Amino acid sequence: MGDTRRRLAMAQWDVFSSRQLEGNSLAVFFDGRGLTDVDMQSIAREMNLSETTFILPRDAAIERERGIRVRIFTVQEELPFAGHPTLGTAFALRGESGAQQVTLELNVGKVPVHFEDNAGEPPLGEMTQIDPTFLIQHNREAVAQATGISIQEFDESVPIETVSTGVPFTVTPLKSLAVIQNLQLDAAGAAEYLAKSSSKFFYFVTRETVDRNARLHARMLFYNGEDPATGSAAGCAAAWMVAHGVAQPDERVMIEQGVEMKRPSRIFVRAAHRDNRVVNVRVGGHSVEIIRGEVFL
């Protein structure tokens, strides 16, 4: 009797890295048509990565007008937007075509990804995120109490601030590399605080870095452990840097993340400043394919 199971073509990419076995892994399914929400969530749990994406092909004319429909799932929930799945999926769709732009339609809306091909370097993809919303600045004592981090370990020269370019992150500056590398987070207290403040996650940053070419060293701890590269949070950090003088408008700077996990990632960010507003947030990086195969359902 023949095998009647459905075969789903997929690939796994290491995102925000030009080297295999580094960066943030992403599973990309090339045709999610016919899958239910429950199917997609179950497959994402099976992949057990930070995120899994499902491409939903449709008429070419619609794709030209609205972008290629993509849905993003963590092991626990669907997300309206996330940076490394957007970049990695765009790389997977681009393939070897050399296309200069791939536009995705996510739950948050259209997100274009532009590609740069420079001689002697791997391609770099750069997504344009939604213009940032600066939500609230936080009291350090309240954050210290919620997270279990000593108040002396925060960088007092810049604010703890929730910023959103589609997903709200609380950018939390710490004093030093030693502090961030030895971070012991009260996960339950942090989650309770975030729920009350309408923020999704803390994004911990410090201006002391491992790579002297980096502007920030970052860590993102969440319910699935730790994320080696968080493009949506990096976009919020880009806006925060420009707003508070850590980076100049339109200056492309690098955020290093994932070092503690031995999954070093390099996220390139920039943002503009016009009419007293931070706008045009761009987040980019490299991506490499590491696995290609099929999943049977």
Spans of model-derived segments:
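Active-site proximal loop and beta-alpha junction motif in alpha/beta enzyme cores
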Residues: 1-81, 87-297
